[in-house]
Amino acid sequence: MDRYPITGRSLEWFFDIDGDLFERQYKRHLSGYRQWKDTPEGLHAGQWRVFPQNIGPHLSIDETSLSRGELYTIVTNKEAHGRKHSIVAIVLGTDSDVVLRALRQIKSELRNKVKEITLDLSESMHRICRLAFPKASRVIDRFHLQRLALDAVQEIRIKHRWDAINADTDGRESAKIEGRKYVAERLENGDTLKELLARGRYALFKSPEKWTVSQRQRAGMLFRLYPDLKEAYRLSQNLRTIFNRRSTKDCARLNLARWYNSVAQAGFKSFNTIAATFYEHADEI
C-alpha cells in the first residue's frame, strides 16, 4: 500500500472504515497539504517542481506536451535512463526566464558540477543552459537534426500533394460544367495521385530497409513521378548514414562537408537552411 496509489474505498473491507471519509481526512489533515502549499516549494508547485537530489554530470533538456497540449520544459538526468530519480526539474511553459528562475532553486555548487547537457536547436534552450549550467558543454541531439531533414522532405511531398488536390478539383469542376462523370486516373497500385502523395508519407519517414512491400512500391512510384522528392529523400538518408556511422570527429566533418556540397548542388531552400544551421552549430553537434 505504501508503494502504489490506491483509493480510500479499497481500504474499507480491510479496516472497516468509510473510504470517502478517510480520503477527505487524509487530504485535509493527514497529508499536510494545506501546510505544504504555503511553503516556498509549495507556492510554485503549479509552475515548477525541482529535485536537486537528482542532478548529475550529464543532463538533458527538452520540451514536451503532457496534458491538453500544454508544453512543459523538462530537465532530466541521463544516467537514470528514464527510471526513478530521472527528473531534475519540470517547468510549465518554455519561457527561459521562468525556467531559469526554477533551476536557480538548485544551489550553484551543484549546477556547476554538470559537465554536459543535451538540447535541441532552440535559442531559448541555449540561453537556459548557458546561464544555468555555465561550466557544462552543450551537445545538440542528432535526432533533432535528422527531424529537420525529414520535415524538409515532407515539405516537398506536401507541395506536390496540394498541386494534385488542386488539379483534381479543377478536373471535377470541368466535368460538372461539361455534364460528364468525373473519373480520377488511378495508378498501377490503385491509388489516385493525391492518394499516393498522402499515403506515401509513411515511407518517406523510414529508411529503405524498413519499408514494407506496399511502401516500397509507393516510394518507387513517388520517386519516378517526382525526381525532386527522390533527391530530397536521398539527402535525408545520407545525413542519417553520417550520424549512424561510427567515425572520428574529423572524418564526420569531412562527410558533412561532402553532404553540404550535395545540398548546394540540389538547390533545395529548406536543405540549404539546414546546412547553414549545421555549420553554425558544428562544434555542438
Annotate each language-model stretch with its function.
Residues 21-118, 123-128:
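RNase H-like nuclease fold core
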Residues 16, 27, 276-279:
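Short amphipathic alpha-helical surface patches that mediate protein-protein
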Residues 150-162:
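Short, surface-exposed amphipathic charged segments that create phosphate/polyanion-binding patches used
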Residues 135-151:
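Inter-helix linker motif
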Residues 1, 11, 59-64, 117-120, ...:
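Short, conserved catalytic/metal-binding motifs centered on acidic residues
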